[in-house]
A protein has these predicted regions:
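Hydrophobic, well-ordered secondary-structure elements that form the walls
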Residues: 60, 97, 163, 202, ...
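Flexible, glycine/charged-enriched surface loops at secondary-structure junctions
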Residues: 26, 30, 208-217, 292-296
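Helical element adjacent to the flavin cofactor pocket in flavoenzyme catalytic cores
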Residues: 1-50
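Mid-domain catalytic core of redox enzymes
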Residues: 34-155
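Active-site-proximal substrate-binding core of FAD-dependent oxidoreductases
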Residues: 32, 38, 287-299
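A glycine-rich dinucleotide-binding beta-alpha-beta segment and adjacent secondary-structure elements
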Residues: 136-140, 199-200, 204-268
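A conserved FAD-binding loop/helix module that cradles the flavin
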Residues: 264-286
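C-terminal segments that line or cap access tunnels to active or ligand-binding sites in enzymes
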Residues: 102-219
């Protein structure tokens, strides 16, 4: 995007954590939620996969619409929602590239690159989904370390890049019953093939990094599924199409009392959309226009 947090994306969480602690909150990690506990159509807490129950007066889900109502809400009569009106967003591959040498030594700039085979972007996507052996529909190349003014102080003589492209979930569906790092040789061979295809675009547009690669790691839609809980490995939750924005039920309030929604499915996709959804959900809970307060404090 147009802004980059000093210290990288982790700085966002690290800046929020003290506020949560100071107001009496608690952050729990490595605690996977199995179920939102519903009693008489009222959310009263969550149940973890280890069986532990955490009771609360409110439950706010940022797990996404699909995950929330297809996996976490397990009551016999789930809310009547027009789920057929929303679709998952596209799945993706992300190649994480570690480099020997600083951005300055390698001549890297912070400008993002968007690489397309031609100007008909819709046709590019349709062609690739129909035949994944054709040209990649798009390759987006980003330079996180170049954008971070604290990078060299914290990480020395290194630099990073990311290269992202679309990838239909069906490419990997044969391995959906497997676990991370235990998917087998065929899966690893496919990852290597895709890594090489992406790197051809990288070398074509950032040729000076050739010979300076220290690490390559490719995430697939299955990686996204396993770490973020999106069943189709979608990159941005639900598809943010015109039809999605016609759905009036996509809002913080739900038909289950004390169960609220937040995250990019409620506002729009990306980091900024997810952050603003927190403000919108807070406004709904407090019944107060918190957005005005935020704008007043930042103006």
């Amino acid at each position: 995007g147009g802004n980059y947090p000093v210290g990288g994306s982790r700085s966002i969480a690290e800046s929020i954590a003290p506020v949560i602690h100071e107001t009496g909150g608690k952050i729990i990690v490595n605690a996977q939620v199995d179920e939102i506990i519903i009693h008489r159509n009222r959310a009263v807490g969550v149940k973890l996969t280890n069986g532990e129950e955490l009771r609360s007066s409110l439950v706010i889900s940022s797990a996404g619409i699909t995950t929330t109502f297809s996996k976490l809400v397990k009551q016999s009569s789930p809310p009547a929602l027009n789920m057929d009106k929303v679709n998952p967003s596209c799945a993706h591959l992300c190649l994480y590239i570690g480099l020997k040498g600083t951005a300055e030594k390698l001549g890297l700039e912070g400008t993002n690159l968007w690489i397309y085979p031609d100007y008909d972007h819709d046709a590019n996507v349709e062609r690739f989904i129909a035949d994944t052996s054709t040209n990649l529909a798009v390759v987006y190349i980003s330079f996180p370390s170049t954008k971070d003014p604290d990078w060299e102080e914290n990480h020395g003589d290194t630099a990073t890049m990311e290269a992202i492209t679309l990838a239909p979930y069906d490419m990997f569906s044969k391995w959906e019953g497997t676990d991370w790092k235990k998917r087998g040789e065929d899966y690893e061979n496919l990852k290597n093939e895709l890594t090489n295809r992406i790197m051809r675009s990288v070398y074509a547009h950032v040729p000076q990094v050739e010979g300076h690669i220290d690490h390559l790691e490719l995430s697939t839609p299955l990686t996204t599924r396993d770490f973020l809980g999106y069943s189709q490995g979608e990159i941005y939750g639900i598809e943010h199409s015109p039809e999605r924005f016609r759905q009036k039920w996509l809002r913080p309030q739900t038909s289950i009392k004390n169960l609220y929604l937040t995250g990019q499915d409620i506002v729009t996709d990306g980091v900024a959309g997810a952050l603003m959804s927190g403000v919108v959900t807070t406004s709904a809970i407090l019944r107060k226009n918190v957005i005005k307060d935020v704008l007043r404090r930042t103006s």
